[in-house]
Amino acid sequence: TALPICMEDVSDHALALMLSCLRHIPLRDRGVREGKWNIQADSFRLKGKTLGVIGAGRIARALIRKVSGFGFAEVVAYDPYISAEQLAEIGVRKVEKEELFRISDIISLHLHANAETNGMICKETLALMKPTAILINVSRGPLVKDEDLLDALRGHRILAAGLDTHNHEPLGAQSPFCQLDNVVLTDHTAYSTAEGVTELKTKAAQNVVDVLEGRTPRYPVNHL
């Protein structure tokens, strides 16, 4: 494998989606291009907000490190596999899932899709969220029940969503998500930067060189 990789890239993208949602950057960009000005859309600052991360692995920790300078009131996390003491070491308070949904202004997903996590973002969890909250998904599409999220966005029961991963890819221009102004959509490329691709190729090549020269590969899967 070439892992760990793309932690910086995906966490950068999560932060970019947060800012895009809070400041309505795509909406304002389109408006200016169409000749509009003084576009009416309430924007919000990051300072004083509560960030909730679901899944506190490498990418989430990279994001937590990056947001430390934005003045968040608190960063909380739900991860059943990481102790409260471990999270406290990086300045994060461990909470239960329901509390995270209730108190967070921004919820960022950083976990694998499996039988336990698929459909985690659903009618019940969306109902717990603040009407000013935003959801960020740079992980996996199946974590979200699309119809439930669409209903919440259409009804303005949450402020916005920033989605890089989707249940159906490519998403397609006819997707209901494309009809909404309170969604920022990208094409499952959170991992893709010039530096990230170079790192991927370098690590993969290093594994080959290690084997050919009789060494244990530097990035074996069972060492993750």
Specify the residue positions occupied by each region the protein language model found.
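C-terminal helix-to-coil terminal segments
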Residues: 1-13, 167-224
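Phosphate-binding beta-alpha-beta segment of Rossmann-like dinucleotide-binding domains, i.e.
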Residues: 2-50, 62-65, 70
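Phosphate-coordination loops involved in phosphoryl transfer and adenosine-cofactor binding
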Residues: 47-50, 72, 123, 132
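Glycine-rich Rossmann-fold phosphate-binding loop(s) that bind the pyrophosphate
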Residues: 56-57
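Conserved S-adenosyl-L-methionine
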Residues: 69-74, 155, 159
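Conserved acidic E/D residue at the C-terminus of a beta-strand in Rossmann-like folds
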Residues: 77-81
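Rossmann-like adenosine-cofactor binding region
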Residues: 82-176
